[in-house]
A protein has these predicted regions:
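Active-site anion-handling motifs in enzyme catalytic cores
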Residues: 1-282
Length: 282
């Protein structure tokens, strides 16, 4: 059996997307070759499911239908959609195998799109991010601010850091291990990046989704979807209409419990579609 997986994920220098090869290599032992959604065998961490929808453009639709025969198979592990409107229509791949999806919202939508009942775990594979650090660093910051890549240069992000006595601005475009280490050094996290929140959950760090702007792609679906896996209502803190949260408000806004996180880790490890190789930690 090959120890390389052909994986589709976004080509963006962003911690969330780059968790794909890191987690798959550390937890399951596979090297990862990044491929397009047309040729990849696995769709994992991220909001890539909409890429597999049948397109409305006739030329694109023809290309997809051909691809559905020439490369019919894709395994799906922990993925989701980015918009509510994405979860409509049907998939062009003829053999989509769903092992886990990001949340209950996506599970129900995929069931509707495929006409199949899915008895599978829900959760984002990024919840295994804590596996990437050999040891947990000591706490250095009372609060970490993790802007989405589109919010990095927003003056409101720098202003938010100044509102707290011991805060750290964390750049999701830095090396992912550096980003995870800095998140783990925080006692609380405020993030407009979904995977900033997921990483904090992975380390059992209280966190709160904050909104700086409308710049990030999506209509909030991916956040609603992620929290639906934990049966938690998504309640973002919009800094355009609310003052910066106090540390106690941020901590009180964290609804996910550590025992839920550990159970998701266990279920997602078990749901990975390929057996661990090369000393993967599974």
């Amino acid at each position: 059996m090959t120890d390389t997986l052909n994986l589709y994920y976004a080509r963006i220098a962003n911690m969330g997307d780059l968790l794909n090869p890191l987690i798959i290599e550390r937890c399951f032992g596979y090297r990862v070759e990044r491929c397009s959604f047309l040729t990849g065998d696995l769709c994992a961490i991220g909001s890539g499911l909409a890429q597999y929808k049948l397109h409305g453009n006739p030329l694109m639709k023809l290309q997809q239908c051909i691809n559905g025969f020439t490369h019919p198979h894709v395994d799906v592990w922990g993925s989701g959609f980015i918009n509510y409107d994405d979860a409509q229509g049907r998939f062009f791949k003829r053999d989509m195998r769903f092992h886990a999806v990001r949340g209950e919202l996506t599970r129900r939508r995929v069931e509707r799109m495929t006409g199949r009942t899915l008895d599978i775990p829900t959760g984002d594979g990024g919840i295994l991010a804590s596996e990437l650090l050999d040891t947990l660093p000591e706490k250095r910051y009372d609060i970490g601010i993790v802007p989405h890549v589109c919010d990095l240069n927003d003056p409101a992000a720098a202003e938010l850091v100044r509102r707290y006595d011991n805060a750290k601005l964390i750049n999701v475009k830095d090396d992912p291990i550096t980003v995870l280490t800095q998140i783990a050094q925080c006692r609380c996290v405020l993030s407009s990046s979904l995977h900033g929140l997921i990483a904090a959950d992975s380390f059992h760090i209280p966190n709160l989704h904050i909104v700086f702007s409308d710049r990030p792609l999506g209509d909030g679906y991916k956040f609603d979807d992620y929290y639906s896996a934990y049966d938690v209502q998504h309640r973002p803190w919009d800094l355009r209409v609310n003052a910066a949260p106090t540390l106690s408000e941020a901590a009180d806004g964290w609804r996910i419990r550590p025992e839920q996180v550990e159970e998701k880790k266990r279920l997602l490890r078990a749901a990975f579609p390929y057996p661990a190789v090369n000393g993967g930690s599974l």
